[in-house]
Amino acid sequence: MPCEVPARRIFSEFCEHEGMALKFTISYREDSLDVFRYYKKLAEGAMVQVTDEQLFTPLDEEANSIAVIVKHMAGNMRSRWTGFLTSDGEKPDRNRDSEFVDPPGAREALMQLWDHGWHCVFSAIEPLSDADLTRTVTIRGEPHSVMQAINRQIAHYADHVGQIVLLAKHFQHANWKSLSIPRNKSADFNQKVRTREISQR
């Protein structure tokens, strides 16, 4: 006779599976938000160290200034995250090429643009349910799972934040205050993480 699995066991295993899936999706959403917040903070820690002039200064004619990178990121954020689940990520009113010229002329206006872009990011991701993470969205008509779309933007923003940090460090030279592990301080950092004095996340 074929083995029969008690209904109670089936139900228990189903609940365990569903619980694990829910924990995974919640963890993914929260981890993604933490990564986005980390890169936002990293860029802001770099930008606060440069002068207003340096904020708008490119290294050469083909390079982007920090201000241009910020304008591009903000434009991308508005396009990708507005109506994230219900509309294409490349909005018809977006003019991507214009994001690389004529940034706002003052730091305050630039940071308002920056903050609005990040508001779009967090407002789209924070309410996502576990069911939402299984959905499909499009970018330029190309299908992406919600997780793929989030991962894509994490990688994109990390790339540009790295550029911002590099430019700021270049301009500040010896006055630069490290935003990661200071040179020759790896052992100290490792010990502080192990003793829970600080977190590396």
What does each model-found stretch correspond to?
Residues 19-34, 101-102, 109:
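Short, charged, low-complexity loops and linkers
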Residues 29, 33-37, 44-47, 52-98, ...:
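Short, contiguous alpha-helical
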Residues 36, 40, 47, 114, ...:
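Hydrophobic alpha-helical core bundles mediating ligand binding, dimerization, or RNAP-core interactions
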Residues 101-137, 144-159, 163, 201:
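Acidic/histidine-rich alpha-helical segments that form the ligand environment
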